[in-house]
């Protein structure tokens, strides 16, 4: 997919996205359903706990939460937001972790679902008090960042292959002249070029996730969404960089990002001077 075509898709998605701010007044997650079932409650009984959401999300969709065996890696959730005008909004989504809870003031970046007017898909949720943002699985890097990361990895593999070749060539009496001969040097450059190209293509395979992230960041007013890597602003990464002595690694910190620091970085590096 060409970059221009991808840019157009991102613009269209950003236009479809809308933002709702308010209080979390109801919440149902995969973990909630699984815990209720573990306590010998039926699925129907478990859904009754989230009855405020049943009429909007639908019992069939909520029942799938309890049937899912992926709750360890990701968590489906349904959420009710009540805005300042006391109007209720309903969303359904799936994040690696669900840390927000009832009573939190949040900002939801959502996409309308085709043929569905009762609820929308939550692309990202921001905790307004702590400036935390959560997104779907792998929705953390823009297109350029994904490509750069993959190309670096490809370059490492290419250099390792060349090093192994040189180690074997070392056993030849004329290994220096052999390695620096034009055919061998040309082969090295071709190997590195192919490694970079493969890395570029691997990075491009994440375009679907990158498109979603870039649309979200564009909606939030970022200057260069395609250059952004939210992983640099994950709580765990920030604690490691700041060398916090009392830091304890917890999984939720790997998937919770500081949107305020990301915005500050974007403004300082790519904002108008």
How should each PLM-predicted stretch be described?
Residues 69-77:
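Short, contiguous, well-structured surface segments enriched in hydrophobic/aromatic residues
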Residues 217-273:
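Charged, low-complexity cytosol-facing tails and large interhelical loops of integral membrane proteins
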Residues 141-228:
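Alpha-helical transmembrane spans
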Residues 3-70, 105-107, 142-144:
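Structural detector for short beta-strands of small beta-barrel domains
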Residues 20, 87-92:
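Short beta-strand segments
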Residues 94-108:
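Short nucleic-acid-contacting surface segments enriched for D/E, G, S/T with interspersed K/R
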Residues 76-87:
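Short, basic/aromatic beta-hairpin or loop at an interaction surface
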Residues 111-154:
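OB-fold/S1-family single-stranded nucleic acid-binding modules
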């Amino acid at each position: 997919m060409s970059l221009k075509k991808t840019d157009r898709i991102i613009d269209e998605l950003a236009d479809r996205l809308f933002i709702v701010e308010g209080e979390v007044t109801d919440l149902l997650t995969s973990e909630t359903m699984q815990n209720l079932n573990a306590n010998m409650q039926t699925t129907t009984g478990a859904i009754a706990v989230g009855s405020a959401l049943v009429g909007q999300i639908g019992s069939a969709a909520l029942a799938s939460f309890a049937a899912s065996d992926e709750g360890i890696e990701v968590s489906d959730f349904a959420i009710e937001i009540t805005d300042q005008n006391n109007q209720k909004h309903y969303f359904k989504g799936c994040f690696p972790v669900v840390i927000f809870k009832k009573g939190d003031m949040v900002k939801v970046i959502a996409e309308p679902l085709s043929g569905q007017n009762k609820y929308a898909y939550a692309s990202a949720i921001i905790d307004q008090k702590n400036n935390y943002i959560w997104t779907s699985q792998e929705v953390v890097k823009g297109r350029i960042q994904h490509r750069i990361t993959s190309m670096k990895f490809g370059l490492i593999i290419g250099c390792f292959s060349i090093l192994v070749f040189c180690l074997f060539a070392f056993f030849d009496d004329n290994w220096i002249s052999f390695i620096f001969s034009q055919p061998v040097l040309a082969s090295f450059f071709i190997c590195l070029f192919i490694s970079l190209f493969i890395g570029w293509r691997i990075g491009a395979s994440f375009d679907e996730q990158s498109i979603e992230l870039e649309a979200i960041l564009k909606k939030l007013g970022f200057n260069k969404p395609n250059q952004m890597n939210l992983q640099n602003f994950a709580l765990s990464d920030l604690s490691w960089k700041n060398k916090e002595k009392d830091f304890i690694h917890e999984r939720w910190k790997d998937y919770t990002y500081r949107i305020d620091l990301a915005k500050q970085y974007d403004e300082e590096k790519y904002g108008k001077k």
